[in-house]
């Protein structure tokens, strides 16, 4: 699974897909930092109070590495950081706004979902995540678990979020994050949100559903009677 915030959860099984994916990421331009470089990178990306340092935001990987105090080999375009812990105290599980990929290992899908929940407690609620799977059950379970407005399936995360002709997402540069993220909408904000709509209302035949129809299993007549009695006492 992947997130708009650069993080990746990878399954480990008997053939150790984790190492396979790590190797392929390196082929694609990733640089796996050592433990020493990880510590240097941590000091470069966050100040003593845990705030992101502005001089490492939206910067090339080589520039970030130089700021941290190590040199990136030629042809490497993003940094890979192995992480095993999640939480506000573990910065690489949070948003980095840079080509720095925090990578986590899991051994079963249920554990991956638990990790997703924990990561979104750190930050990123309402935004997006992705899953690289053909298992519809896994995709559906992630959709029920992740507090996000968009889930990209087998797609490049940030570009697919913004809409494409092959995924049905409205094209935009502004992604609504719903009440999860303190926004009014959870959609891709696009043309319809900037168009004024005039509602013309005329009287129609009353079609009022009963409380039982409205609330279903949540409807309790006893509570309604209790509320009515309380109103009568106040009157």
Label the predicted regions.
Residues 70-235:
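Conserved C-terminal structural/oligomerization subdomain of aldehyde/semialdehyde dehydrogenase
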Residues 5, 9-124:
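NAD(P)-dependent aldehyde/semialdehyde dehydrogenase
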């Amino acid at each position: 699974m992947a997130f708009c915030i650069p993080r990746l959860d990878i399954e480990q099984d008997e053939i150790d897909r984790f190492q396979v994916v790590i190797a392929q990421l390196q082929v694609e331009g990733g640089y796996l930092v050592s433990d020493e470089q990880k510590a240097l990178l941590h000091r470069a990306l966050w100040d003593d109070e845990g705030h992101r340092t502005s001089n490492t935001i939206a910067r090339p990987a080589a520039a970030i590495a130089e700021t941290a105090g190590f040199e990136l080999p030629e042809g490497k375009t993003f940094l890979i950081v192995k992480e095993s812990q999640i939480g506000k105290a573990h910065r690489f599980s949070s948003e980095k706004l840079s080509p720095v990929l925090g990578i986590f290992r899991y051994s079963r899908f249920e554990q991956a979902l638990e990790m997703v929940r924990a990561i979104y407690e750190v930050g990123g609620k309402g935004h997006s995540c992705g899953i690289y799977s053909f298992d519809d059950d896994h995709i559906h379970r992630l959709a029920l678990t992740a507090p996000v407005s968009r889930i990209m399936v087998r797609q490049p995360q940030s570009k697919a979020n913004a809409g494409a002709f092959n995924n049905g997402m409205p094209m935009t540069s502004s992604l609504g994050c719903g009440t999860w993220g303190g926004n009014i909408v959870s959609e891709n904000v696009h043309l319809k949100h900037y168009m004024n709509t005039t509602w013309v209302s005329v009287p129609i035949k009353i079609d009022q559903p009963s409380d039982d129809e409205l609330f279903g299993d949540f409807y309790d007549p006893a509570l309604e009677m209790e509320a009515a009695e309380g109103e009568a006492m106040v009157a």
